[in-house]
Swiss-Prot record:
GO biological process terms, semicolon-separated: glutamyl-tRNA aminoacylation
Lineage: Bacteria, Pseudomonadati, Pseudomonadota, Alphaproteobacteria, Acetobacterales
Protein name: Glutamate--tRNA ligase 2
EC number annotated for this UniProt entry: 6.1.1.17
Motif 'HIGH' region, residue range(s) on this chain: 8-18
Cystine connections: none
Catalytic activity: tRNA(Glu) + L-glutamate + ATP = L-glutamyl-tRNA(Glu) + AMP + diphosphate
UniProt KW keywords: Aminoacyl-tRNA synthetase, ATP-binding, Cytoplasm, Ligase, Nucleotide-binding, Protein biosynthesis
Positions bound to ATP: K242
Pfam families named among the record's database cross-references: Anticodon_2, tRNA-synt_1c
Chief localization: cytoplasm
Length: 447
């Protein structure tokens, strides 16, 4: 069975870049009736916070993503210790004692010599006696993984054939001096323990994947299938910063972006398919890693906003009823949804049809038109034909047409230059409110 995982670090709020990876994993699991696990990579105890862990879970649920299993890495220290012991016994983990200053000096020296700043494995040459002496002097070792002297290759699910030359990479530190295991190591151990079959993540993990493939094999396992999505860029082709608060899911939700719109946008971003407002189930039916380009994708806020508008236009009343102003009806929603950039704007139009507006100040000529229009209002009950019946009568009486006719009426009735069709709004407003607004506006002083 397909088993994927989404593994954020709870050191901040979920950003669109990570959210895209979560969406890809969730859709892949749905597409193949597989399992989706939420793993919190929280071994960095200093930076990880419970509030971020909870926020990540909330944001995923907001997008409609559910998981079959979830766990925190901090709860699996025994698992990592056992794996580390096995690697130490096989000679693949070795202790190191160099300070950051010593390592920096070595890197600078190699660069001056025209050599790649790869760790020189000097600690492999230490004798047991030298190690014992270092520890006796108060030094605590950190541990590196001894990489194989080879090139690791795989067929990437998005990028195609990929290779990583392990000889060109420093042996990674996998356990700090304080005993804390690091991501490169813990991720592999957890993927083995939980039976992950596919790893879908960003292309910034390409080198990690080479190293981790070697780690899988050192632990006697075959690495899962790998797929790396190209990183997101901003609309201008620059790097998309994870530090921009406006691109966290929390901020996007506050700004009125609908979860369906965001998921639909992220699901197809960088692929050959245009985004459409679809449910997770609908997106999963056609989800295919082969559809993604190997080139970087651009996250364009204006495109997301446009998709948000389209999403609102397709949402039924039942999906938004609880978030509309109290008393709002299905007829109201049908009338206004085509004019909304975000759902919160429905409040403005509810005030128009059921509340009050500030009377606009019009010219004397426009006020005269309103006075002509007032007695021509049809008798109730009103329906969607009332507007055309009324304006036809006003046109004949005033000899006005087009913008000269419709603009003063719209301003007087709604206080806005543009908006939903007045044929739909007029029956919702009712005759009494319409008469009151025409009277108040036409009696206002012209500017």
């Amino acid at each position: 069975m397909v088993h994927v995982r989404f593994a954020p670090s709870p050191t901040g709020y979920l950003h669109v870049g990570n959210a895209r990876i979560a969406v890809a994993n969730a859709l892949f699991a749905l597409r193949y009736s597989g399992k989706f696990t939420l793993r919190l990579d929280d071994t960095d105890l200093e930076r990880s916070r419970d509030e971020y862990a909870e926020a990540i879970a909330q944001d995923l649920r907001w997008m409609g993503i559910e998981w079959a299993d979830t766990f925190r890495q901090r709860d699996n220290m025994d698992r990592y210790e056992a794996a580390a012991d096995a690697l130490k016994a096989s000679g693949r983990l070795y202790p190191c004692f160099e300070s950051e200053e010593e390592l920096r000096y070595k890197r600078e020296l190699r660069l001056k010599q025209g050599r790649a700043p790869v760790y020189d494995r000097a600690m492999l040459k230490m004798t047991p006696e030298q190690r014992a002496q270092a520890e006796a002097n108060g030094k605590r070792p950190y541990w590196r993984f001894l990489l194989s002297d080879r090139t690791v290759g795989w067929r990437d699910g998005v990028l195609g054939p990929r290779q990583v030359k392990l000889q060109a990479i420093s042996d990674p530190v996998v356990i700090r001096a304080d005993g804390t295991p690091l991501y490169t190591f813990t991720s592999v151990v957890d993927d083995i323990a939980t039976g992950v079959t596919h790893i879908i993540r960003g292309e910034d993990h390409i080198s990690n994947s080479g190293v981790q493939t070697d780690l899988f094999e050192a632990l006697g396992k075959v690495a899962p299938a790998l797929a790396h999505l190209p990183l997101l860029m901003d609309a201008d082709g620059g790097k998309l910063s994870k530090r921009i608060d406006s691109l966290t899911l929390r901020s996007l939700a506050r700004d009125g972006i609908e979860p369906v719109a965001l998921v639909s946008y992220l699901a197809r971003l960088g692929s050959s398919r245009d985004p459409q407002p679809l449910t997770l189930a609908e997106l999963a039916q056609e989800f295919d890693l082969d559809a993604f380009s190997a080139s970087s994708a651009r996250f364009d806020g204006s495109q997301l906003a446009a998709l948000n508008r389209r999403t609102l236009q397709t949402m039924p009343f039942s999906a938004v009823q609880d978030r509309l102003p109290q008393g709002a009806t299905e007829a109201f929603w049908e009338a206004v949804r085509g004019n909304l950039d975000m759902l919160a704007e429905a409040r403005l139009w509810w005030d128009v049809v059921a509340g009050s507006i500030v009377p606009p100040v019009l010219t004397d000529e426009d006020n005269a038109l309103l006075k002509q229009a007032l007695p021509l209002l049809p008798q109730e009950p009103w329906d969607t034909t009332t507007w055309s019946v009324w304006t036809r009568a006003v046109k004949e009486a005033s000899d006005r047409s087009g913008r000269a006719l419709f603009r003063p009426l719209r301003l007087a009735l709604t206080g806005e230059e543009h908006g939903p069709e007045l044929a739909a709004l007029l029956p919702l407003m009712g005759a009494e409110r319409v008469r009151t607004r025409l009277t108040l506006t036409s009696g206002a002083m012209a500017g």
